[in-house]
């Protein structure tokens, strides 16, 4: 398994948790199929959130890397780890950054951030 961030490759989920910047693609069932690796089955959705946001150009209906890097940087500056935030907090920060469309999963985690123009 090779998880990707701009500075290094991560070999474990623990490293992924530490760096949180991952480049992955998603199949039609929402499973993580990455160009650099696959997250283990059963990885909580909360830990996969950035993977689902930070997808490749193969999935143009979801926001691309450059916007996700902005999002990651913003959360980092605010002292948050993205997957630890509540849905209302996520909504607030998405709104601040111009993420106007998103869907929620039944378990309460925001799953998809759709590609759209920032207002």
Model-predicted segments: where are they?
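Short glycine-aromatic motifs
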Residues: 1-3, 20, 94, 99-103
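Short, hydrophobic beta-strand segments that form beta-sheet elements in well-ordered domains
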Residues: 2-5, 22, 82-86
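Conserved donor-binding loop and adjoining core beta-sheet/short helix segment
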Residues: 17-63, 104-106
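Acyl-donor binding region in acyl/amide transferases
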Residues: 46-97
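Short, charged/polar, Gly/Pro-enriched secondary-structure boundary elements
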Residues: 117-119
């Amino acid at each position: 398994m090779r998880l990707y961030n701009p500075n290094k490759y991560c070999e474990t989920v623990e490293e992924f948790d530490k760096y949180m910047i991952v480049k992955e693609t998603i199949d039609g069932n929402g499973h993580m199929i990455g160009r650099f690796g696959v997250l283990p089955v059963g990885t909580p959705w909360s830990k996969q959130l950035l993977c689902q946001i930070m997808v490749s150009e193969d999935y143009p209906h979801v926001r691309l890397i450059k916007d996700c890097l902005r999002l990651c940087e913003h959360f980092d500056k605010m002292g948050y780890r993205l997957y630890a935030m509540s849905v209302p907090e996520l909504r607030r920060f998405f709104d601040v950054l111009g993420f106007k469309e998103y869907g929620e999963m039944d378990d309460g985690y925001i799953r998809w951030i759709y590609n759209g123009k920032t207002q």
